[in-house]
Amino acid sequence: MSWNRRSFLGALGVTCLAGAGMVPIVRPRTAAAADEFDLLRERWCSLVTGSGYDPDVEPFKSRLAALGAEAEQYLTTLAPGETSLWPDLPLDTSTWNMTLSARRLRTMAVAYLVPGTGHTGNSAMAEAAVTAFDELTTRFYAPPHWWGNWWDWLIGTPQALNDFCALLYEQLGPELIDRYVQRVDHYVDPGAIDRTTGANRGWLCEVTAVRGVLGKSPEMMAKARDGLSPIMVYVTDGDGFYRDGSFIQHEYYAYTGSYGISLLQSVSGLFALLAGSTWEIVDPNRQVLFDSIENSFAPFVYNGLLMDAVAGRVISREAEHDHWRGHLLAASVLRMAEAGSPEEAKRWRGIVKGWLLRESEPRYMGDQTLTMAAVADAQAVLDDPTIEPLPEPVEHRIFAAMDQAVHRRPTWAFSISMRSVRTAFYETINGENLKGWHTGVGMTYWWGADFGNDHYTDGFWPTADPYRLPGTTVSRKPLEDGVGNNVLPTEAWAGGTTDGEFAAVGQSIQALESTLRGRKSWFCLDDAVVCLGAGITCADGYAVDTTVDQRNLGENGVHDFRLNGIPSPTSGTWSLTVPNARWAHLEGFGGYVFPGGARVSAIRETRTGSWYDINVGGPRDELRRRYVTVYLDHGVDPVDASYVYLVMPGATRQETIRRAADRRWLRVLANTADRQAISVPSLGFVGANFFAPGTVDALTVDQPCSVLVRVADGRATICVSDPRQDGSTVRVTWNRPVASVVSSDPTVRVVEAGERLVLDVTVEETAGMTQRAVVALA
């Protein structure tokens, strides 16, 4: 449903509690009796329950029945006592149990109101829920109680209870509603919104707005609306959205795929709630939020999943996997489409439709955690023939503010997760993400158009070897669970440069709780990512590995794997080291090439673990997964070790062998601690990461920087960035004749263009983003 001021004012003469065609209990009122707050409350109910769908057809019929069964379970097990409403959720040991109790009440309210649950209009359900609500807000969510996690008191519990009160507003009556509003005012004090940023601020604005609706408070409505304004600006440090598309939460963490989604959920709900009302969101900076959908969120979605690289500690939660997060984002984008321009709305719906149609298991429409509203919105898009599903883009994006990069090709996607003095190694709080120590030292992820889409979903994090994460160079020194929270590296060089299709990405690595140092680069090309490492030095007294890949084959995977042509058995535990291997291939995933040959090791094994091992709130059930791991052993305490390898997602065995045999495809121009560079003549590509001033082939620079050159059709595009984000001007000399400068960014000054090209590139205040010039070749 599209919300606007005309439809809002017209609705003042009509009332239904949870959307057209949805409510079994109709309460007619005169137009005079329905004030603006009544309509806002009814609109919020519609946003909670969904509208415009037929409860007698799938996928709604079975979902409504499941909702009813869940509510019935809560009804039959409800047993208010001294310390709980439900025996399995003691309220004196965990404030999270208070939030979960509130959510159960909300489920009961929804089951009572919507058709097809088997409890529609069931007075016993409503009466039990109201009685339990009375208990909760008298003895538990009430002053002077205050302990545990602040989030449950200010956000989690009132979010669910707001929905509950809106849904059962008339059953609760003025006295209980008024008392509840006072509870919210006590915990969400007048300064609460202004003390928060990012997702927390969005959540609190939502809590305040719905509380304002329930209490009919214009002041609270204005406070909630105005509280959104600081979210709708670009930041240059700390929490929020950055111009390059980054989203940071908790000061130092890439959190687009967790807190970022939560922010979009809250804000999209408020746009829908307030549209056309006295408190409509009209801040001109709201375009920042609209732009974030394609600038911040969509680049991290592939075939409907939202990449783990930007999910922080959430990767340790069993239920909140990459597909589930993608579902939440899709639902929020569809809701936000109601607020965007017609062009944006059409494009966003097309993006989401593409995600829905391409997604592998677990699919959106089978996700039982989604609300009826989210399912109804998605079904409407799927059923609309005028909405064209948009394909995955072919592009490269560097998110310099949060040290992330994403490379997209027609049949695969690849992500690189880095850290620097700007971003902490990993976050572990509340007993979560206990072994995430090395997720930021160059971890790589990749997925194919039709393979590997459940690789990280299927028990990867509790069963994978945390010392051999793909792409990382790591000391085997044992680390304690949870060590190093909020610790930042001292190295500044992380990032790279891109022409929008290919890229040179690099990182000066510093490992957590280790003496390990080194340089890593990834050159992202058409059918491969070329990976270089150099200057790898460590004095921990432990072996150091570079992990080429650690592939999860599932519980019983028997994929064919060959190292330099030597097959591995498909069962049991197997390991092999080949002194001069040139290639490896894993059926169903892709190939790996080692130019010039390398000492390569591989393991096939069954690994076990539980979610509890990495998250104290996770189940203890043991999981078993089969893995193939390919790695380079640099030995104990290496000095200036190096490597070169290619990852070829989706490549067949024959394609891998051909690339390994082609000695002319790749030229490694430099691979030292000061500079890493390659040339691929067939692509007209040169990429160079300078960790110090110097010369590589025809390129000379006077400051640390990243440079990419693409030559095609008589022109060259020169791209430059400052991954350290602390420089002022970089002089780049390309020792090749040029005829003229076709175009350049305002930051690029042409010093010389003739027998050679000399550019002075102002990188100060460019935040690590790429600066470009295009020249015609002589």
UniProtKB/Swiss-Prot annotation:
GO biological process, one term: carbohydrate metabolic process
Gene3D superfamilies given in the database record: 2.70.98.10, Chondroitin AC/alginate lyase, Polysaccharide lyase family 8-like, C-terminal
Top-level taxon of origin: Bacteria
EC number: 4.2.2.1
GO terms assigned for molecular function: carbohydrate binding; carbon-oxygen lyase activity, acting on polysaccharides
Modification(s) after translation: Predicted to be exported by the Tat system. The position of the signal peptide cleavage has not been experimentally proven.
Entry-linked Pfam families: Lyase_8 (PF02278), Lyase_8_C (PF02884), Lyase_8_N (PF08124)
Family stated for the protein in its record: Belongs to the polysaccharide lyase 8 family.
PANTHER family per record: HYALURONATE LYASE
Protein name in the entry: Hyaluronate lyase
Gene name tied to this protein: tchly8B
